[in-house]
Amino acid sequence: TAPAHLQEETMEGADLVADALGRINRILHRAMDGIPAETLNTQPAAEANSMSWLAWHLCRVQDRHISDLLELPQLWVADGWHAKFGMAKDEKETGTGHSPAQVEALRVDSADLPLGYADAVYERAKQYLATMKPADLDAAINEPQYDPLPTVGVRLVSIISDNIQHAGQVMYVRGLLERQGWLGV
């Protein structure tokens, strides 16, 4: 079917979020499909992140927050993605604060692994967003460490902000390593 903004219906906030997350998923595929593992795992500088690490981290952030909003276990554990990546069964592990050694330790044999995880978390996000009503975006999230409490809408914008930055970094690292110009999106 056509995207919501091309249909006769009014586009809602959740439709915008779904569109943004879909674009992020396509950026990852465009940047990583067919790229050799050596390139995916290369850190362009000693303390820089590899394409594989950036894609993994992007997915972890999206999986964690969407799963929290759904009040469901993260796909990271529920679908065994942690084992596929050879990592601990730890839902709090998203890569934030990783040392250069931890970044270097995350290795993939092909783009299939991070892209498979990206597709899985995006599908979950789409399913969640398809159930939303406009008022749902204004619902407060019970996270008392924040004042004011964040809303579902604020959390979704945070996911987009984080993910679009990291998707752009994946594209940038690919350009650095392959010494090619902008691929576009």
Question: Would you name each region that the model predicts?
Answer:
Residues 18-29, 39-97, 123, 140-185:
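Short, contiguous alpha-helical
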Residues 88-139, 157:
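Acidic/histidine-rich alpha-helical segments that form the ligand environment
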Residues 1-10:
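Short, Lys/Arg-enriched N-terminal segments with co-localized hydrophobic residues
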Residues 10-18:
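N-terminal leader segment of winged-helix/HTH proteins
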